[in-house]
A protein has these predicted regions:
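Pre-NBD coupling/linker segments of ABC/ABC-like ATPases
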Residues: 2-16
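Conserved beta-strand-loop-alpha-helix hinge in the C-terminal portion
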Residues: 237-261
């Protein structure tokens, strides 16, 4: 059964472990007094360590705004975002880049690989910037590549890879620093069904084997069915969530479809 949030917030009691992410009554407004847009309207949610969570909602529901606030790219108008025990609003501007690199991993719809670097060098980039010793970089890069099944492309350049391989290289780059939280923004949006399946199976496997915590924005019900929990947002707040529990992926997909039908559809425009 879907749980409808009586205050527009997801349940804060997820597990006994310390939450990786806590979003508390966050608002985000744009414009002036005469034309104010409320992108986030009392948004609250909690993600525990090791969760694989999908965020779904129609165009204009606040998905991208929320992700930008969590990523410290944008700042909320009010409310609190706690990431790995740190209030992100209190991080100095000079520390933000280091905080993102150390605590967060990013997977975008487009892989955003550097064309002049091999897959190995692209994956290693956040470690190189962080001045990790070369021997450790090689060990970590090989391990990340192995977890995503892309060892054979490590010495290839992006133009020599398929779209699916490029996206898995991007995922390896996001995971190589062992971040507290991976933010995946429509990671399968540019992939065909075969490559989307390979990426989602890899993320699911990494979540289960390495305990990686992943928050994925998606409009795709199939992609969401790989997650353990789905949060549906509307008008800038969570209004329903589904927990997979013991369901098979197919059964969970059917439950997701039921909620989407009631909600009136989830489109790919954000």
């Amino acid at each position: 059964m879907a749980r409808h949030m009586d205050s527009g917030s997801a349940s804060l009691a997820r597990s006994a472990s310390t939450p990786v992410l806590e979003v508390r009554d966050v608002t985000k407004t744009y414009g002036g007094h005469s034309a104010t847009t409320h992108a986030l309207n009392g948004m609250s949610l909690t993600i525990a360590a090791g969760e694989f969570v999908a965020l779904m909602g129609p165009s204009g529901s606040g998905k991208s705004t929320l992700l930008n606030c969590i990523a410290t790219i944008d700042a909320p108008t009010s409310g609190t975002i706690m990431l790995a025990g740190t209030d992100v609003s209190r991080i100095s501007r000079s520390r933000l880049a280091d905080f993102r690199r150390e605590k967060l991993g990013f997977i975008f719809q487009d892989s955003n690989l550097l064309d002049s670097l091999t897959a190995r060098e692209n994956i290693a980039l956040p470690l190189t910037i962080g001045r990790v010793p070369a021997a450790q970089i090689e060990t970590d890069v090989v391990a990340a590549a192995a977890s995503l099944g892309i060892e054979e492309v490590l010495d290839k350049y992006p133009y020599q890879m398929s779209g699916g391989q490029r996206q898995r290289v991007a995922a390896a780059r996001a995971l190589v620093t062992n971040p507290q939280l991976v933010l995946a923004d429509e990671p399968t949006g540019a992939l065909d069904s075969k490559n989307a399946k390979l990426l989602l199976e890899s993320l699911e496997s990494i979540n289960q084997s390495r305990g990686a915590t992943v928050l994925m924005v998606t409009h795709d019900e199939t992609a969401a069915s790989y997650c353990r929990r789905v949060l549906f947002i509307r008008d800038g707040r969570v209004f329903t969530e589904l927990d997979r529990g013991a369901d098979s992926r197919h059964a969970f997909f059917e439950r997701i479809m039921q909620v989407v039908a009631v909600q009136g559809g989830v489109d790919d425009a954000r």
